[in-house]
Design a protein with these regions (language model features):
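NTP-dependent small-molecule kinase module
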Residues: 97, 116-154
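Conserved substrate/cofactor phosphate-moiety recognition/catalytic segment
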Residues: 1-38, 50-53
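A glycine- and Lys/Arg-enriched "phosphate-lid" helix/loop adjacent to the NTP-binding pocket
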Residues: 59, 67-118
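Hydrophobic/aromatic beta-strand patches that form the interior of the parallel beta-sheet core
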Residues: 1, 40, 75-79, 131-133
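A basic- and aromatic-enriched beta-loop-alpha substructure that forms the phosphate/nucleotide-
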Residues: 27-72
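Well-ordered, non-membrane alpha-helical segments in soluble/globular domains
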Residues: 20-28, 55-65, 108-117, 144
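Short aromatic-enriched loop/helix-cap "lid" or pocket-rim segments at secondary-structure transitions
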Residues: 52-53, 88-93, 145
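Conserved nucleotide-binding/hydrolysis micro-motifs of P-loop NTPases
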Residues: 45-47, 81-88, 138-139
Length: 154
């Protein structure tokens, strides 16, 4: 499915800090330089917005970023999950087993639920086409099919 795609995990610990908007702008410059390639960004400007709001009580205006992204025909796929603390605890255990260093930044399930609520609120303000998918149950072929249809790949 991802043949020919380039993937960037953009959340490298700088969103929600004084460097967050610089990171967003640099990735945006990179996207504009690579505009003829298929690129997946894991967490981008919406994450900067959520982190600034939750952790610094600041509103981040991402309208200019989205204007530039719109010119690139960018789309957003927001993965959501059931707001079930037991499910979140299980996912955290799995992640920490795979990546033990994640334990240093892992949060309580209630914090992930709070973040998700912010994501779901702010996505409605996006100028970009977006799709919200529930990733509570994985693997999930219907979820994959929905994403491919949204992207025009199926």
């Amino acid at each position: 499915i991802l043949d020919g795609c380039h993937w960037f995990n953009c959340d490298v610990g700088l969103y929600g800090t004084e460097h967050g908007q610089t990171v967003v702008n640099k990735y945006l410059e990179l996207l504009e330089s690579l505009k003829n390639l298929n690129i997946i960004l894991e967490k981008f400007h919406i994450t900067e917005y959520v982190y600034q709001k939750l952790y610094n009580n600041q509103e981040y205006d991402f309208s200019e970023v989205e204007t530039r992204l719109k010119k690139l025909d960018a789309k957003i796929i927001l993965t959501s999950f059931q707001e079930d603390e037991d499910l979140i605890k299980k996912r955290l255990e799995d992640r920490i087993n795979l990546y033990p260093h994640y334990a240093k930044i892992a949060q309580e399930p209630a914090e992930y639920i709070k973040q998700q609520q912010e994501y779901l609120d702010i996505i409605k303000q996006s100028k970009l086409d977006y799709l919200i998918v529930d990733s509570s149950q994985l693997p999930n072929q219907k979820l994959v099919d929905d994403i491919l249809i949204f992207l025009g790949e199926k």
